[in-house]
Amino acid sequence: MNRLWTGTEDNPFADRTVLIAVQPLWVEPFVKTFLEEGGHPLSVHKAEEVFPILQFEQPEFFILSEGFDQDGSQSNPLLGYIQNMPMNQRREIFAVWVSANIKTGDLLSAFSCSVNLVLQSEGLSEMSKQIKKSWSQWKDLYQVFLQTRLQVSGR
């Protein structure tokens, strides 16, 4: 079972790798929050930096945003990567999409973006609280599935 499913119930970030691929303006608040929570933030500035990392390590959290390493007319290449992941891999990560145009916690927007949570960029001060709440709900949903899969297949 992935490390994302182990650890303390109240702190999903403790000893977990968090890949941060957001607009430069938003990097600092995320890095600061995850360091304070005991996580291991890994911020990247260009999409080309991410794919070599993903060959050797699968971060437990992906924090992505519109406008990352693009001119605005293109979609985020990392979001495309997550959307095309095999489902057994996708279930092992928690993806957050940051946008100025989407309301924080909008489930339909999260579903349409294939992420676990959407955050509005104006509400980044509450990001830790929002991510913890959403992660807890997500873990409650998938934990039964993963426990059953482990019992049936042994992996």
What are these regions (language model features)?
Residues 1-33, 133-155:
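Non-catalytic signal-transmission and effector/linker regions of two-component phosphorelay proteins
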Residues 20-25, 45, 64-68, 98-100:
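Structural motif
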Residues 37, 57, 112-115:
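Short, structured coil segments at secondary-structure junctions
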Residues 45-61:
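Acidic, metal-coordinating helix/loop segments flanking the phosphotransfer/catalytic sites
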Residues 60-86:
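Conserved phosphotransfer microenvironments
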Residues 89-102:
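A short, hydrophobic beta-strand element within the central beta-sheet of small alpha/beta folds
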Residues 99-117:
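Alpha4 helix (beta4-alpha4-beta5 surface) of REC/receiver domains from two-component response regulators
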Residues 123-131:
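C-terminal output helix
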